[in-house]
Amino acid sequence: MKVVIVGGVAGGASAAARIRRLDESAEIIVFEKTGYISYANCGLPYYIGDVITDSGDLTLQTPESFWKRFRISVKVNHEVTNIDVTQKTVKVKNLLTGTEWEETYDKLLLSPGAKPVRPNLPGIDSEKIFSLRTVEDTFRIHDYLEKTKAQNAVVVGGGYIGIEVAENLKEKGLNVTIVQRPNQLMNTLDYDMASFVHSKLRAKGITLRLNSNVTSFRQDGECIVTLLEDNSEIAADMVLLAIGVAPENSLAKQAGLKLGVKGSIVVNDRMETSVQDIYAVGDAIQVKHFVTEEDTVIALAGPANKQGRIAADNICGGDSHYQGSMGSSIIKIFDMTVAGTGLTEKVAKSMGIDCESVVLSPASHAGYYPGAKVMTMKVVFEKDTWKLLGAQIVGTEGVDKRLDVLATAMHAGMKANMLKDLDLAYAPPFSSAKDPVNMAGFMIENIRNGFVKQYHWDEIAGLPRDGSVTLLDTRTAYEYKSGHIDGYINIPVDDLRERMNEIDDSKPVYVICQSGLRSYIACRILTQNGFDCYNFSGGYRFYASVIKEKEMSEYTYPCGMEK
């Protein structure tokens, strides 16, 4: 059997190695149009920022190492330009010599990846405007920075790549501005959770231009000027485009393969395309969203590696099936960690799903053990079925662990309230006896059992201030004086039983505290005394971050007690 693979990196390279492990006699040829067969594309921004200092560390495999270990023929700087599906041949061009020839195949695997979105804007062809997708792109940006000693940079786009590049340029000493068309960075987060990202970046000195649309670029002496829709201008030494990526489908389109969402290559769960003996994996393909089962495109390295393995199994006569992607992802933003999986609340509601969410601010480990830090978790679930829909976490330590547990629970089909039953590892340096994931489950179970009703940050402005409801802040007097929401009266939770006569039991009571715990306790006290209570999801800390985009303290206090 002769297998030709178009494209290396995650999907193609993992498939090639798997095929060899399954079939020692197969002839395997990999064509890669860049100069690198398998590289750490997720690490490219960190080479720009000199976090990774050795360019060789970006290379995971070389043509020589692939041949020596796997006897796989890898040809870099070779582009496949045409597929003849009838004759089962591909046309190959050596990009260094210009030589072209045809190569036959029994099985063909496409792993072309994605290409950076580069809108047709005036001035976009300037040599001072860069995209980051390949190792060669990385070297060009790095060399430009070293050569020009650039001081100011504009990053267009506020997704993962844009933020990582902005961070690394800032760490390198540049003044950085991020321009983003929507009103928030990171569309994998809800606006409320993205507010923590905004606060962190601003605290680190990065300028954010949200709700800003780029209309053109202009060369002005040694500067490149970015022009925005509101007629403002930003002068800089360089511009990095990180607007997003689109499936690289030119070869698939030429071959007549069926295309789907955003021009992606349609495959079944065996990674087979619409043409027999042609498979496809990675950022170029259409996948099923694991939560919604709808067709989508999810360009991440983890899914690409799994897809490569599944395609290899089936090429070699197996019967492996891809179960879909949830989009589990994580990013470091200076000393902050941000992670998410599944659907955001905004996306779920836009799809007509009747959903609810809980927001909590647990500690990374036991509060009495030194170094515990607060994380903010948001868990989204369907109201009627209690199905887990998604989760988002912002914090420092322990974020990755909790996100992975939540993603695993979603994959296993657990209901949201069942999170309380998970038996998770505990010792004071690592967690609490009630792990944050368990705590989310407890909160959801309380809602399910009718023990508490919630209200959210975007409802506060609409609450009446005419005396028809009671707005109650149950924090300490010190906390209340340090900052509170207009219209809220202060009765600390520990004084509530003695001062309950100050609250009119004929009016609904909307309760808030710092994180949501004391206000929940207050709601239970009041509810059992005949009051109609609503607990604020997330607490004042969360509200202040969302409304004021204020960077809140990352430290917690012993035993979960708040100052």
Question: Which stretches of residues belong to each language-model region?
Answer:
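Mid-to-C-terminal Rossmann-like scaffold of FAD/NAD(P)H-dependent oxidoreductases
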Residues: 1, 8, 284-397, 428-432, ...
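Beta1-alpha1 glycine-rich phosphate/pyrophosphate-binding loop at the start
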Residues: 1-77, 117, 166-189, 328, ...
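A Rossmann-like FAD-binding core segment of flavoenzymes
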Residues: 25-27, 69, 75-96, 103, ...
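Rossmann-like dinucleotide-binding cores of NAD(P)H-dependent redox enzymes
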Residues: 59, 152, 160-218, 298-304, ...
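Short hydrophobic core segments
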Residues: 103-113, 156, 234-244, 308, ...
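Glycine-rich dinucleotide-binding loop and its adjacent helix/turn
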Residues: 110-172, 207, 261, 267-269, ...
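FAD-site-proximal beta/loop scaffold in flavoenzymes
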Residues: 125-149, 221, 233-310, 405, ...
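Rhodanese-like catalytic fold shared by cysteine-dependent sulfurtransferases
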Residues: 417-428, 432-469, 477-508, 514-563
